[in-house]
Swiss-Prot record:
Residues 601-610 have a biased composition (Basic and acidic residues). GO terms for cellular component: membrane. Residues 71-85, 186-187, 233-266, 338-355, 415-423, 473-486 are extracellular. The keyword NAD does not apply. This is Solute carrier family 23 member 3.
Length: 610
């Protein structure tokens, strides 16, 4: 075991085999004398499985939270099938979407999972039938409150409500896929700067704090223990390295390279420890809404129409439009944030278009399987990438396979519901904090001292948090006389991320400002143009390959019809031709809490996975 508190090595995805290699400490005067050489070779399968299991735990936390809040909002009653099968169908659709996303979508190691962008419209849709079921006076959060009084009766069966929500998920998937096929990111990105993306990330980190506190409230001791262990493993013990597996150096000699095990497993170790402790003290109890009256089957094949087909109504169409707009805004933010945390160039429009298209396909699959939640890029999983400072396509593929396996076995999926709620709250709290800090750190890319920018940032964040709270605490909701329009307006005006992105976009493009002031220097149409402009040409060319399609599919691009050419990279990417004259040491490490330069040798390791 070795410890290097002054220069902790940063881990990133390198090589076509997705190996994780520690970066050398900075040596500005002689870059060739780094204490560590770039390492090649495939990532050990044991470590890959552990890293994938961490992502599954974070995804399971999101799924349990989403299903629990939604089922608690329904009228008293019950499902005609096991809730574990509903959870398994969500795992299956998320796993398939993750595999497609990392293989031929954005190509980033992004895990697909449901988010608040799907939950909020679903709650609005069900609350229209249950006006007194989930509204608690004086409370602005999505309360875990089920109306059990005599006034809550005969308001519809659970199956019918979930059918309508599944219909909204199908509509959102179709709209999101259409936006990707039409190349919407390519039209929007040139008008988006750091002042559009950064407020959205800040609001994304803050928007779930009430729900996190609600789950932590069930047992603050266990929640604080999880948070404390995650902080200690990822930060205080992050520089402790162990010789755990053999790697091959750039030279011909073979050696054992130490890895920061505590930081890499800073989610798995705390969750496993507290989960075991809570089981010993008898606190690991499955919530009533997720408990199955009968044992779930070990093997089960999800297929469309098993529990009735999705119900397409005007109200479901309105909720689906809100889901599509909010989920697309959130996903584009995840693409840019994940690329930045992995020190890649900003994702090009063709990668974002493919990502949105395949996310839409995943949501359509989820809705047809009866899941009440669609699939989108997950902010908590991106926060986990920033927490452990590593990302790998190989790990993301394993996550997808594990989720498909859980979807085929409801009994195994039900096992994850035994994770104590305070553990779920603690994990989501730490990962959301990383997203929040990444949003704050993005402001430096623009002139934050400008009065124009100060107003845009403050107004966007404050209004995105104020409007949802006002609508949730309003004693009487607005009524237009047409229920679908009420659902659409209420869903959009209670989506914090959508409001932050929309207000930032409108203010950024209507208030006069210079390109440099807006953070759009050198004419590069991306949210992180200042970062890309400082990246040397050769490392940028190598890193940009991660967004390109796999070789067999790349050969099919000439056969794609002209309207769909936005899904394929250009023969000569303009971003690859613009070089920079700065040295590798000028590219600062953008991960939260670190300030080490990123050497050129590490950036040359990025390659697309064939």
């Amino acid at each position: 075991m070795s410890r290097s508190p002054l220069n902790p090595s940063q881990l990133r995805s390198v090589g076509s085999q997705d190996a994780l290699a520690p970066l050398p400490p900075p040596a500005p005067q002689n870059p060739s004398t780094h204490s560590w050489d770039p390492l090649c070779g495939s990532l050990p399968w044991g470590l890959s499985c552990l890293l994938a299991l961490q992502h599954v735990l974070v995804m399971a936390s999101l799924l349990c939270v989403s299903h629990l809040l939604l089922l608690c909002s329904l009228s008293p009653g019950g499902l005609s099938y096991s809730p574990s099968q509903l959870l398994a169908s969500s795992f299956f659709s998320c796993g398939m979407s993750t595999i497609l996303q990392t293989w031929m979508g954005s190509r980033l190691p992004l895990v697909q999972a449901p988010s608040l962008e799907f939950l909020i419209p679903a709650l609005v849709l069900t609350s229209q039938k249950l006006p007194r079921a989930i509204q608690t006076p004086g409370n602005s959060s999505l309360m875990l409150h089920l109306c059990r009084g005599p006034s809550c009766h005969g308001l519809g069966h659970w199956n019918t409500s979930l059918q309508e929500v599944s219909g909204a998920v199908v509509v959102s998937g179709l709209l999101q896929g259409m936006m990707g096929l039409l190349g919407s990111p390519g039209h929007v990105f040139p008008h988006c700067g750091p002042l559009v993306l950064a407020p959205s990330l800040v609001v994304a980190g803050l928007s779930a704090h009430r729900e996190v506190a609600q789950f932590c409230f069930t047992h603050w001791g266990l929640a604080l223990l999880v948070i404390l262990l995650m902080v200690v493993c990822s930060q205080h013990l992050g520089s402790c390295q162990f010789h755990v597996c053999p790697w091959r150096r750039a030279s011909t000699s073979s050696t054992h390279t130490p890895l920061p095990v505590f930081r890499l497993l800073s989610v798995l170790i705390p969750v496993a420890c507290v989960w075991i402790v809570s089981a010993f003290v008898g606190f690991s109890v499955i919530p009533q809404e997720l408990s199955a009256p009968t044992k779930a089957p070990w093997i089960w094949l999800p297929h469309p129409g098993e529990w009735n087909w999705p119900l397409l109504t005007p109200r479901a169409l309105a909720a689906g439009i809100s889901m599509a707009l909010a989920a697309s805004t959130s996903s584009l933010g995840c693409y840019a944030l994940c690329g930045r945390l992995l020190h890649l160039p900003p994702p090009p429009p063709h990668a974002c278009s493919r990502g949105l298209s395949l996310e839409g396909l995943g949501s359509v699959l989820a809705g047809l399987l009866g899941s009440p939640m669609g699939t989108a890029s997950s902010f908590p999983n991106v926060g986990k990438v920033g927490l452990i400072q590593a990302g790998s396509q190989q790990v993301a593929h394993l996550v997808g396979l594990l989720c498909v396996g859980l979807g085929l076995s409801p009994r195994l999926a039900q096992l994850l519901t035994t994770i104590p709620l305070p553990v779920v709250g603690g994990v989501l709290g730490v990962t959301q904090a990383v997203v929040l800090s990444a949003g704050f750190s993005s402001f430096y890319l623009a002139d934050i001292d400008s009065g124009r920018n100060i107003f845009i940032v403050g107004f966007s964040i404050f209004m995105a948090l104020l409007l949802p709270r006002w609508f949730r605490e309003a004693p009487v909701l607005f009524s237009t006389g047409w229920s679908p329009l009420d659902v659409l307006l209420h869903s959009l005006l209670t989506q914090p991320i959508f409001l932050a992105g929309l207000s930032g976009f409108l203010l950024e493009n209507t208030i006069p400002g210079t390109q440099l002031e807006r953070g759009l220097g050198q004419g590069l149409p991306s949210p992180f143009t200042a970062q890309e402009a400082r990246m040397p040409q050769k490392p940028r060319e190598k890193a940009a390959q991660v967004y390109r399609l796999p070789f067999p599919i790349q050969n099919l691009c000439p056969c794609i019809p002209q309207p769909l050419h936005c899904l394929c990279p250009l023969p000569e990417d303009p971003g690859d031709e613009e070089g920079g004259s700065s040295e590798p040491e000028e590219m600062a490490d953008l991960l939260p809490g670190s300030g080490e330069p990123c050497p050129e040798s590490s950036r040359e390791g990025f390659r697309s996975q064939k």
